[in-house]
Amino acid sequence: MRGRTVSARRQTRRGEPFGHHGRPAEAFYLQKVGGTEAGIALGCRLVGEMLEKIEAGQRPLCLLRQAKQAQRALAGMSQEQLDKITAAIAAAAGEHARRLADMAVEETGFGKKEDKELKNRFAATTLYEAIRDEKTHGILAENREKRTIDIGVPVGIVAGLVPSTNPTSTVIYKSMICMKAGNPIIFSPHPSAVNCILETVNVVRRAAEGAGAPAGSISCITTPTLEATNALMRHDDTRLILATGGGAMVKAAYSSGTPAIGVGAGNGPAYIHHTADVRLAVKRILDSKTFDNGTICASEQSIVVERRMEGAVTAELKAQGAYLLDDEEHRLLSKFILRPNGTMNPAIVGKSVETVAKLAGLTRVP
């Protein structure tokens, strides 16, 4: 069987799946193997899966080759040239901030359009202002007394893993910080946010190339699969992974053998001290937790207070629009949001209070 498979592969022409004299790969496989109807179905499925895995593993390789060529050109650019590219990305992202936010919410069903837009603008404007004058290229600092010189050099090709909760803003800021330092970046999109991520990549890519960035500086896997992402993360030419997403994905990045910087859920408790301004503390906690329907990785998950503060904090929460559950409502909500294995029900992610209450059967929540 192994010899026949090799023979079939030799018949491949012009990148076609290994068929035989124009016939589909499945037909050739079945002609050689034969079998019952169940065997035929199994053969078709196995060949299809094998072809998909081969193709998925090849997609990142093409992007990596292009990125490697871009890396050589970026390495020869001056700080002024890199700054021009970064500025162009910021301007384009700001111009399309609302449209990209709308796309993200419509595709994923997560969050609020106005908050997604604010995140896009934060990445495009606030982040840009913070890094605009930072020197990343060449001699960064010199200490004559200690006889040391700090020299900035590109790290190389970066793999950018993008989540579905913050898809467009993540692409914007990762593109900016990579171009600022002269590093090509290849994005691996979350499967449930492919379209808005690809469109954001196109926006920043066109802006970057229009400002002088070489082709291949910013790219994206168009059909995300586990095989494609792993191939990208583990390739020798990938020098750094910027992983934003769930715990399993961040863990996979850390165990890939490539240096990685991971960002995942960090939704911890907020402690209100007895000396705090209760009104202001509650306002900030509610603003944080409700922003983009709680999709921010650092939005507060719970509130901790001293017993003597409980009444004041509870009253302030109600005054600012929070709804406090009674024991039965607490039971219903807990049963809905926590699955038997201890994980969270994904149906609540990025959804409004009204939607979560309805799904959990809470009829009194306004």
Give residue spans per PLM region.
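Compositionally biased, low-complexity flexible segments
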Residues: 2-16
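Aromatic (phenylalanine/tyrosine) cluster motif
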Residues: 18, 28-29
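N-terminal Rossmann-like NAD(P)+-binding subdomain of aldehyde/semialdehyde dehydrogenases
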Residues: 47-149, 177, 319
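ALDH superfamily catalytic-core signature
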Residues: 54-57, 172-173, 250-366
